[in-house]
Amino acid sequence: MSIDTQSIIENNKRSAHDTGSPEVQVALLTARIELLTKHFKIHKKDHHSRRGLLQMVNRRRSLLDYLNKKENERYKLLIEKLGLRR
């Protein structure tokens, strides 16, 4: 169980060498969150990793809020592309 970082970056980058834009960061966090969510269906008592999951969710929320405030159109496209709520 792992994420394919390179393909996620390729699908969400804004320019040729982009790896740090909010879109890429949110997409990577979303993949890691989905992976951990599957992990918790099996390992219900893994509270240490649950803390990491909550930190990732909060970090993603912050990045999405930033993107929404700065460039609303990019925010809307990203939400639709990743299938996130809102």
Curated annotation (Swiss-Prot):
Entry-linked Pfam families: Ribosomal_S15 (PF00312)
Identify the stretch(es) annotated as Disordered: 1-21
In terms of superkingdom, the source organism counts as Bacteria
What are the record keywords, sorted?
Answer: Ribonucleoprotein, Ribosomal protein, RNA-binding, rRNA-binding
Cellular component GO terms, alphabetical: cytosolic small ribosomal subunit
GO terms for biological process?
Answer: translation
Transmembrane regions listed in the UniProt entry: none
Q: Does the keyword rRNA-binding apply?
A: yes
**What PROSITE patterns is this protein classified in?**
RIBOSOMAL_S15
Instruction: Give me the stretches of Polar residues compositional bias.
Output: 1-10
Q: What are the protein's GO molecular function terms?
A: rRNA binding; structural constituent of ribosome
Gene3D superfamilies per record: 6.10.250.3130, S15/NS1, RNA-binding
Q: What does the protein in this record do?
A: One of the primary rRNA binding proteins, it binds directly to 16S rRNA where it helps nucleate assembly of the platform of the 30S subunit by binding and bridging several RNA helices of the 16S rRNA. Forms an intersubunit bridge (bridge B4) with the 23S rRNA of the 50S subunit in the ribosome.
Assembly mode:
Part of the 30S ribosomal subunit. Forms a bridge to the 50S subunit in the 70S ribosome, contacting the 23S rRNA.
Q: Which family does it belong to?
A: Belongs to the universal ribosomal protein uS15 family.
The record's section on HAMAP family has:
Ribosomal_uS15_B
Q: What's the name of the protein?
A: Small ribosomal subunit protein uS15
Query: What is the source species?
Result: Xylella fastidiosa (strain Temecula1 / ATCC 700964)
